From Swiss-Prot:
Protein name: Probable Xaa-Pro aminopeptidase P
Pfam families assigned: Creatinase_N (PF01321), Creatinase_N_2 (PF16189), Peptidase_M24 (PF00557), Peptidase_M24_C (PF16188)
Keywords recorded for this protein, A-Z: Aminopeptidase, Hydrolase, Manganese, Metal-binding, Metalloprotease, Protease
GO molecular function per UniProt: metal ion binding; metalloaminopeptidase activity
InterPro entries, A to Z: Creatin/AminoP/Spt16_N (IPR029149), Creatinase/aminopeptidase-like (IPR036005), Creatinase_N (IPR000587), Pept_M24 (IPR000994), Pept_M24B (IPR033740), Peptidase_M24_C (IPR032416), Peptidase_M24B_aminopep-P_CS (IPR001131), X-Pro_aminopeptidase_P (IPR050422)
GO cellular component: cytoplasm
Binding of Mn(2+) 2, residues: D449, D460, E572
Annotated organism of origin: Aspergillus terreus (strain NIH 2624 / FGSC A1156)
Annotated CDD domains: APP (cd01085)
Enzyme Commission number(s) from the entry: 3.4.11.9
Binding site for Mn(2+) 1: D460, E558, E572
PROSITE patterns registered for this protein in UniProt: PROLINE_PEPTIDASE
Reaction(s) catalysed (UniProt annotation): Release of any N-terminal amino acid, including proline, that is linked to proline, even from a dipeptide or tripeptide
UniProt-listed SUPFAM superfamilies: Creatinase/aminopeptidase, Creatinase/prolidase N-terminal domain
Length: 654
């Protein structure tokens, strides 16, 4: 599962005798016969919705209105009740910003969703392709629409304080202004059709899985706050709260979190969550250490804290710490910049470094998850090739979930399974829908990006298979991606190295061909938490220069290759950073490397061994031997799957 950037339209020659003879520069477009696939996605008529929104904008004296994707906690994944951008635009991808003026509307998203957005947006909308040269950012488009002293409105709960300041400064240069608008105007348009907020129960995440008590975590956080000489920390990120208190929920699909806020001071711990969501077990778990308050009272309490701080010591009083991802609304309630200090959350940093119990859980859950994947791919090949069964992408995804659910400690999926055949694989965050998805073609590449939540860890894995005979082009592309994945997996680097610096390792072999993939190479992964976790990552994002890879980080390694309209390739393992022994220690500092924990075969018939070095062939063979060793015992009574696993983990050679 991955971040950012667009799929690439590639140019390859079909006139070659072997993989090594593929042209290295200025290749020509090739032509292959591609069966017809159902890739259309439903387009929503937004005319009436936009008309009603524009009337509300006039009522609130707003000329341009911004509709972000995020909720009040700046969550990447959101509950259905917070799907405002999707409701107003019709675009269902997980990332994007909608901007509506009194006469125009635009949707900005990144390259994972260009294909999807172009299909889902109706004629009312302009698609702003983020990161494409010559295309305006949503901020630039907004500023242009607001020229002449116009007012731009946004729900202050849905934009970060830093984002609001930056946009406001840009607008002011243009003679325009930014205005916080409550209630949310899209909610008013949505009306009674808007889904109700979730009311599911919160559960305790036992220490045998968490590895540390919540009291110890709060104690360590207080030590950090003491170093910063702050009055306290106001927490709004849902995964940080779940991690800190060793609690989990189901308020957001695939993310075991619950709607809440928290305030930690040197002497108090307050958790803002509605009481009816807390079971007796949760209340006993929190005990006398935590004061529970209603979820909606956070803003009033923040204002009271701000007022009390001013009254007690004025401007000389310690400031409250606030995450740089916290909302503008929360910042304003605490008194804004004068009374808050925005920083990268110390909880995010602590959460990203898994303890020994969490790391052991990650290893264990990935073995079980690997067994599920092996059973699934063996089943899928048998159905498609031997039984000639007609299966669509959703049928296959449902089967994978069914197989996963049989395994110990399974708690659900970690994201929507990307089950994609042929050209659908080039839609990087493709989401198959029953009734419109494609029938899986055994003679085309099949890309499956999936993951699960287990009580002892979170998984995320992508495998690309071909159940027929792949072309030389497909094998070449797959092998280049594999080489990059191996290079990152095998990396040794000094402590303090960032994911930004490591990113080139995964891209180098594609770059040598003048090719690239325009998404991140790796993201952090939570421990029975969000499948996308910061603050570190591997990619070209500027923020990845700020956070070095540290021992205990759990990260995805997922280079890819996408030929728009034809196929997609991605190979993804989860890797854990750890200290390694080296012959020398230049600068007398620790050196780090990675341990892979994903245990699933890499499609052998897509590998072109002649493109691999001896060390890369050894890596493939060692990896497959490890997969066999750790998973074959699951199939003692399943000869079909065991035989498939044995075949798919046999050694390769040039």
């Amino acid at each position: 599962m991955l971040f950012s950037h667009p799929p690439i339209r590639l140019a390859w020659s079909s006139a070659f005798r072997s993989a090594r003879q593929l042209p290295l520069s200025r290749p020509r477009f090739f032509s292959i016969s591609v069966p017809r696939y159902a890739v259309d996605m439903e387009t929503v008529d937004t005319t009436e919705r936009l008309s009603r929104l524009r009337q509300l904008m006039k009522d609130h004296q707003v000329d341009v209105y911004i509709v972000p994707s995020e909720d009040s906690h700046q969550s990447e994944y959101i509950a259905p009740c917070d799907g405002r951008r999707e409701f107003i635009s019709g675009f269902s991808g997980s990332a994007g910003t909608a901007i509506v003026s009194l006469t125009k509307a635009a949707l900005s998203t990144d390259g994972r969703y260009f294909n999807q957005a172009s299909k889902q947006l109706d004629s009312n909308w302009v698609l702003l392709k983020r990161g494409v040269e010559g295309v305006q950012t949503w901020q630039e488009w907004t500023t242009e629409q607001a020229e002449g002293g116009k007012v731009v409105g946004v729900d202050p709960a849905l934009i970060t304080a830093s984002g609001a300041r930056s946009l406001s400064e840009t607008l002011q240069k243009n003679g325009s202004s930014l205005k916080g608008i409550r209630p949310n105007l899209v909610d008013l348009v949505w009306g009674n059709d808007r889904p109700s907020p979730p009311r599911e129960k919160v559960t305790v995440h036992p220490e045998k899985f968490a590895g540390k008590s919540f009291q110890d975590k709060i104690s360590e956080l207080r030590k950090e706050l003491e170093k910063k000489k702050t009055a306290g920390f106001v927490i709004s990120m849902l995964d940080e709260i779940a991690w800190l208190f060793n609690l989990r929920g189901t308020d957001i699909p695939y993310n075991p979190v619950f709607f809440s806020y928290a305030i930690i001071t040197p002497t108090t711990a307050e958790l803002y969550v509605d009481d009816d969501k807390l079971t007796p077990e949760v209340k006993a778990h929190l005990g006398q250490d935590v004061v529970v308050k209603p979820y909606d009272s956070i803003y009033a309490d923040a204002e009271a804290l701000s007022a009390a701080r001013k009254q007690d010591a004025g401007d000389a009083a310690p400031k409250f710490l606030l995450s740089n991802k916290a909302s503008w609304a929360l910042s304003l309630s605490l008194g804004g910049e004068e009374q808050t200090e925005e920083v990268r959350s110390p909880i995010a940093d602590a959460k990203a470094v898994k303890n020994d119990v969490e790391l052991s859980g990650m290893r264990a859950c990935h073995i079980r998850d690997g067994a599920a994947l092996i059973e699934y791919f063996a089943w899928l090949e048998n159905e498609l090739v031997n039984k000639k069964t007609t299966l669509d992408e959703v049928d296959a995804a449902d089967k994978l979930e069914q197989i996963r659910s049989k395994h110990e400690l399974f708690a659900g999926l970690s994201f929507d399974t990307i089950s994609s055949t042929g050209p659908n694989g080039a839609v990087i965050h493709y989401k198959p829908e029953k009734g419109s998805c494609s029938i899986i073609d055994p003679n085309a590449i099949y890309l499956c990006d999936s993951g699960a939540q287990f009580l002892d860890g979170t998984t995320d894995v992508t495998r690309t298979f071909h159940f027929g005979k792949p072309t030389e082009l497909e094998k070449k592309a797959f092998t280049l991606v594999l080489k990059g994945m191996i290079a990152l997996d095998s990396a040794v680097f000094p402590k303090g190295t960032s994911g930004f610096a490591l990113d080139v390792l995964a891209r180098q072999y594609l770059w040598q061909e003048g090719l690239d993939y325009l998404h991140g190479t790796g993201h952090g992964i939570g421990s029975y938490l969000n499948v996308h976790e910061g603050p570190m990552g591997i990619g070209t994002r500027v923020q990845y220069t700020e956070v070095p890879i540290a021992p205990g980080n759990v990260i995805s390694n997922e280079p890819g290759f996408y030929e728009d309209g034809k196929f997609g390739i991605r190979i993804e393992n989860v890797i854990m950073a750890r200290e390694v022994q080296t012959p020398h220690k230049f600068g007398d500092r620790p050196w780090l490397g990675f341990e892979h924990v994903t245990m699933a075969p890499i499609g052998l018939n897509l590998i072109e061994p002649s493109l691999l070095s001896d060390s890369e062939i050894k890596w493939v063979n060692d990896y497959h031997a490890e997969v066999w060793e750790k998973t074959h015992h699951f199939f003692q009574n399943d000869e079909r799957t065991r035989s498939w696993l044995q075949r798919e983990t046999q050694p390769i050679s040039k």
